[in-house]
Regions:
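Conserved N-terminal segment of class I S-adenosyl-L-methionine
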Residues: 1-80, 84-86, 100-103, 142-148, ...
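Short, glycine-/aromatic-enriched active-site segment of Class I SAM-dependent methyltransferases
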Residues: 123-144
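Helix-to-beta-strand junctions that scaffold the AdoMet/dcAdoMet cofactor pocket
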Residues: 21, 94-95, 110-112
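A structural motif corresponding to the C-terminal end of an alpha-helix
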Residues: 157-163
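Glycine/Thr-rich phosphate-binding loops of Rossmann-like dinucleotide-binding domains
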Residues: 36, 75, 95, 126-127
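Short catalytic micro-motifs in class I SAM-dependent methyltransferases
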Residues: 89-93
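A short glycine-rich, Lys/Arg-flanked "PGG" loop and its adjoining helix->strand segment in the class I
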Residues: 100-112
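Conserved beta-strand signature within the Rossmann-like core of class I S-adenosyl-L-methionine
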Residues: 113-120
Length: 187
């Protein structure tokens, strides 16, 4: 990762941090190398990161485990329930056909009252990232996986009765969005 990649990643983590409390059991989808856990430093036991591009030699660290694989099918059966599910710059990598299984997996693994924290860039970011990649200022991790995601889809994917939107805000000059959902008690 370049300095700019890390800067943008840290910005997303800072936006998520207020919604993650000390001791929360966290599931980080698209965890990369576990940076969210390292930045938080206070996640509860049983916290888990999952990412299909983790190197096969990736090792779990004290306080959290890392699993190479796809969500939800590769989450260990013993995992969860979680207080928080984080998807920081991840949702746009899911094809539309996977939104249903994604939402169902999140509903199954998130405790009632638990929080799901999502950051998703606006479609304009893809053009900006293309330029930054050409200038070698960012690596543009998995840009080929962006599927033309529209931000307005987000509340519909994680809809009632299983989820309740409790916060939506834009940041990074409107180029990124934060969504926070609460898992309802409805099944």
């Amino acid at each position: 990762m370049t300095f700019v990649d890390r800067f943008l990643q840290d910005w997303r983590v800072r936006k998520a941090r207020p919604f993650i409390h000390a001791g929360d059991r966290v599931l980080d989808l698209g965890s990369a190398d576990g940076v969210l856990f390292e930045r938080l430093g206070n996640c509860g036991p049983g916290s888990l990161g999952i990412d299909p591009i983790l190197p096969a030699t990736t090792r779990s660290r004290q306080g959290f485990a890392l699993v190479r694989g796809y969500f939800p099918q590769d989450v260990p059966a013993s995992a969860g329930p979680f207080d928080v599910i984080a998807m920081l710059a991840v949702l746009e990598h899911f094809p539309a056909a996977q939104y249903g299984p994604l939402a169902e997996g999140c509903a199954r693994l998130l405790k009632p009252g638990g929080r799901m924290i999502i950051t998703v860039p606006s479609p304009a970011v893809d053009m900006i990232l293309d330029v930054l990649v050409k200038l070698r200022l960012v690596h543009g991790m998995s840009l080929e996986e962006h599927h033309g995601y529209e931000i307005s889809q987000t509340p519909d994917i994680f809809a009632a009765p299983k989820f309740e939107l409790i916060e939506h805000a834009s940041f990074q000059l409107g180029l990124n969005n934060l969504f926070v959902f609460r898992r309802t008690k409805a099944s």
